[in-house]
């Protein structure tokens, strides 16, 4: 019986593949894959044909895996580097975005506010800013209707007087405003003499009203000041008429009085007594604080009213003489009698 044929496992030098060949006496063999003829150098296994074929498959599989390892490693390294590059790029992009986001948001918030305000203004909605804590609340607006004049205190206002006053002689005097003048006009109803004007503010501001019940302005009240001749005027006596004659200016007579003049007095003294005894149209107001004395009973050098009384500040206005001359108070009370100094 013939022996079994043996086989060998050989490797080609050109294609680097493993293959099984039968054992022969010649040393030369040809590659089944690439067809290159080559000599026998090394046997990687020897046995039956089936065993050699299984062994060749295993060797070629391992050779293929080994050859694929560098490629895989290269691919893995390349992929890893690419991933790293991609990661670095992404990280850089994220950082750039993070850096750019604050600046963009900082500007965008103002733009959004402006756009919102513009939209609200377009729709007709307006907002009022709240006042800061430092700013005070605005006070009430100045009204032009309020008076700008200085307020008059009631302490300086004189006591009111009635509109219709009846003097001692029975003649009734009425108040009445006169156009173009700030004072009052007294009209005597029962007398035929003209009216006298009064510029003193004897009545209070509430009583100084005209026919239309209109208050006189404070300027008109201020202009109704007293006259410098008011202290020489005497209050009216009992009479039914008003004398409008002006008192004459008196001068002192340097010559001594004669025996005829001693009884009747000098003409100037008589004129002075007549002028002082004649009543005026001024109404005696309730401010008089002392009784009135006649011309002969008054002392020389003193007036009939005290300087501290309201008559010193303001009183009835007397019509001045056409040619006023300086007079002495002593001349107003000359009796015309001579007195001997030796007695």
Swiss-Prot record:
Residues where Phosphoserine is found: 100, 115
Modification comment:
Phosphorylated; phosphorylation is constitutive and occurs in the absence of any DNA-damaging stimulus. Phosphorylation on Ser-115 is necessary for its nuclear retention.
Q: Where is this motif: Nuclear localization signal (NLS)?
A: 148-151
- List, as start-end ranges, the regions of compositional bias called Basic and acidic residues: 240-255
Q: Does the keyword NAD apply?
A: no
Residues annotated as region Necessary for the association with the MRN complex? 213-237
Which PANTHER family does the protein's record reference?
MRN COMPLEX-INTERACTING PROTEIN (PTHR15863:SF2)
Instruction: Tell me the function of this protein.
Output: Plays a role in the cellular response to DNA damage and the maintenance of genome stability through its association with the MRN damage-sensing complex. Promotes chromatin loading and activity of the MRN complex to facilitate subsequent ATM-mediated DNA damage response signaling and DNA repair.
Its name, as the record gives it, is: MRN complex-interacting protein
Q: Which organism is it from?
A: Homo sapiens (Human)
């Amino acid at each position: 019986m013939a022996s079994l044929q043996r086989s060998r496992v050989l490797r080609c030098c050109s294609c680097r593949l493993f293959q099984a060949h039968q054992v022969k006496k010649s040393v030369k063999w040809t590659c089944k894959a690439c067809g290159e003829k080559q000599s026998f150098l090394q046997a990687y296994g020897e046995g039956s044909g089936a065993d050699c074929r299984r062994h060749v498959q295993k060797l070629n599989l391992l050779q293929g895996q080994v050859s694929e390892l560098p490629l895989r490693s290269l691919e893995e390294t390349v992929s890893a580097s690419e991933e790293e590059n991609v990661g670095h790029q992404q990280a850089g992009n994220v950082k750039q975005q993070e850096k750019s986001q604050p600046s963009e948001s900082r500007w965008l918030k103002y733009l959004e506010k402006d756009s919102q305000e513009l939209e609200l203004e377009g729709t007709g909605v307006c907002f009022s800013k709240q006042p800061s804590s430092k700013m005070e609340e605005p006070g009430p607006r100045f009204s032009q209707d309020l008076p700008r004049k200085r307020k008059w205190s009631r302490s300086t206002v004189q006591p009111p007087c009635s509109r219709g006053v009846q003097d001692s002689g029975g003649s009734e005097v009425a108040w009445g405003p006169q156009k173009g003048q700030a004072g009052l006009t007294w009209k005597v109803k029962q007398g035929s003499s003209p009216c006298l004007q009064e510029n003193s503010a004897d009545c209070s501001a509430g009583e100084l009203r005209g026919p239309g019940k209109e208050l006189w302005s404070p300027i008109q009240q201020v202009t109704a000041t007293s006259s410098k001749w008011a202290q020489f005027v005497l209050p009216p006596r009992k009479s039914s008429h008003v004398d409008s004659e002006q008192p004459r200016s008196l001068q002192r007579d340097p010559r001594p009085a004669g025996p005829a003049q001693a009884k009747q007095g000098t003409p100037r003294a008589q004129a002075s007594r007549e002028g002082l005894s004649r009543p005026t149209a001024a109404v005696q107001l309730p401010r008089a604080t002392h009784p009135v004395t006649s011309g002969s009973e008054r002392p020389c050098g003193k007036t009939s009213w005290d300087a501290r009384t309201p008559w010193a500040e303001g009183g009835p206005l007397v019509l001045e003489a056409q040619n006023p001359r300086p007079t002495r108070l002593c001349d107003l009370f000359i009796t015309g009698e001579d007195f001997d100094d030796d007695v």
